[in-house]
Structure formats: C-alpha cells, structure tokens
C-alpha cells in the first residue's frame, strides 16, 4: 500500500469522518508525487461529492479555463495536487456551503504535502485557504489579495472561487479576467512545461 493510500485510509477511519465513511463517501483529494501545482480550495461541493471527482462541476470548468488547461491534463497528468481545506462536503449554510471543518487542514495537509516534494505553486482559492496559508484574518478581503497576487508569488497565488455564484464579483472586477487570469495561465504553462 502506498503512503498516500495509507493516509487516505487513516482519513476515512478518523472519527471526525466516520459519518461519511459509513455512507460510502471517500475523501476527495489528489496528491501525486509528481505534482508541481497544488490547488487548495474550501471543500468539495455537493455535486463533486456525488460524482466522486474533485472539481467536476461548473466551478471546475471555470477553474480549468483560468488555468488554460484541459480536463485530461488536470486529472491525468500527475502535475496537479488538489488538497482542499476539507475533503468532504460540509453541508449547506444560509448563503452557500458551510465552511470547512476546523482542524481538518492542520491534521491532514502536512502529511500529504510531504508526499508532494515538487510543488512549485499553490493556488489558494477563497477566504479559508487564504486565511490559513497566508496567516491573515478570514475577514480580510479576498478581492485585495487577488488584486495583489504578485505579493504572494512565487509560492502562492490567491484566487476568488470560480463558482458561477461569483458572476456579480466578476462583473464588478473586470481587471481579474483582463489581467490576473492571463498571468495565471502564463505561470501555470511555464511550470507544466519545464
């Protein structure tokens, strides 16, 4: 059994995840040893959990557009790790999905990241990933972080969530698709084709 498979089994056996395991739901993440880019989002949505494949929804389609890549490269190249703040759908809240469970990333991220020694860039999608990895307040402005993404390079690239629910944000911030997305695509392509 590989080290990643051992970690996956430990995640599934953890009491915090017992209810998911009993329902036949496996944790959604990918941590190939060959990964060069790590994608850290909030947690799988309900559709991705039902499909059993991370980023297999409209948000994932938009994310792949932003990266300038296709599904085959995203899922099968071994160049992308996907290690969200929670590996299970946390449920619905008043204005969207509930936040990732506290303590989840602290417990599992270090073990998985140790297995991915070649990560060159980590995409931090949304406020929870950004607050955790950039050590900033959750209430900090995602927009400001994304606008000033160069301040976090070469290690991190903060992004807004690619959800269709963010259409209003996209309309209010046209600089994102005009300036940030092309920079992201260029950087991702350089890393993938080294």
Locate each region found by the language model.
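Short amphipathic alpha-helices and their capping/turn segments at secondary-structure boundaries
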Residues: 24-33, 62-74, 113-114, 148-150
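Glycine/proline-rich loop-helix segments at beta-alpha junctions forming the active-site rim
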Residues: 2-9, 16-19, 86-194
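Short, surface-exposed acidic-centric catalytic microdomains
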Residues: 53-100
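Short coil-to-beta-strand
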Residues: 33-41, 76-84, 154-157
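Active-site and ligand/interface coordination hotspots across diverse enzymes
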Residues: 1-59, 185-194
């Amino acid at each position: 059994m590989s080290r990643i498979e051992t970690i996956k089994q430990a995640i599934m056996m953890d009491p915090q995840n017992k209810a998911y395991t009993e329902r036949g739901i496996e944790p959604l993440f990918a941590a190939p040893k060959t990964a060069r880019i790590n994608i850290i989002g909030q947690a799988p949505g309900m559709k991705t959990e039902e499909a059993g494949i991370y980023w297999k929804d409209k948000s994932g389609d938009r994310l792949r557009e932003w990266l300038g890549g296709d599904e085959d490269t995203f899922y099968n190249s071994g160049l992308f790790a996907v290690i969200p703040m929670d590996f299970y759908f946390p449920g619905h809240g008043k204005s969207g999905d509930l936040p990732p469970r506290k303590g989840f990333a602290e417990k599992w991220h270090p073990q998985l990241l140790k297995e991915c020694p070649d990560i060159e860039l980590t995409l931090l999608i949304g406020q929870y990933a950004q607050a955790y990895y950039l050590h900033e307040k959750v209430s900090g402005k995602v927009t400001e972080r994304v606008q000033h993404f160069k301040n976090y390079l070469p290690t991190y690239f903060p992004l807004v969530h690619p959800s269709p629910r963010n259409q209003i944000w996209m309309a209010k911030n046209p600089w994102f698709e005009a300036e940030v997305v092309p920079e992201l695509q260029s950087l991702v392509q350089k890393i993938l084709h080294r």
